[in-house]
Amino acid sequence: MIDDRAARAWAILFARAVVGLIFFMAGVWKVFQLGPIGHVQRYFLPFQHTFLPTWSLWAVGFAIPFVELIAGGLVIVGFQTRPALLSLGIILVIVTFGHLLDKPLYALHEHVIPRLALVLLVLLLPREWDRFAIDAIFRRSTPSDRSSPN
């Protein structure tokens, strides 16, 4: 029988693995198959006709694939989990803004909301529950510091 502490650790591992994989695999596809420039051209340059400066479309569109790849990988292994999740949350805000700029009634419930729910779940669960993370190894090897943002 699995006790409550172990069940919580497994639950957060599964949630962390799923949200990490979603973003990591999106990053893999965007970096290695589509290419960062292709990502900009396909998903960001169509917004050139808006008030957004073209340089910002290039900068954000080029960076997102790498952030998804790196932050997703960090979430999977549980290293610097909270900063990685904050990065992914920022990406979700950017993506939501872009979709709503294009279509004000965009169906957020299909893609954005499930990802946001997982990001928030893992972000808000107590760090102490996440026993199967690299962050947990560092917590065990150093004195507890409740003011740490990680």
Q: What is each model feature region?
A:
Residues 40-44:
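Glycine- and aromatic-enriched periplasmic loops at the membrane-periplasm interface
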Residues 47:
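Short, helix-capping/interhelical loops that line the mouth of catalytic, cofactor-
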Residues 1-39, 50, 54-70, 77-150:
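Extended, low-polarity transmembrane helix blocks
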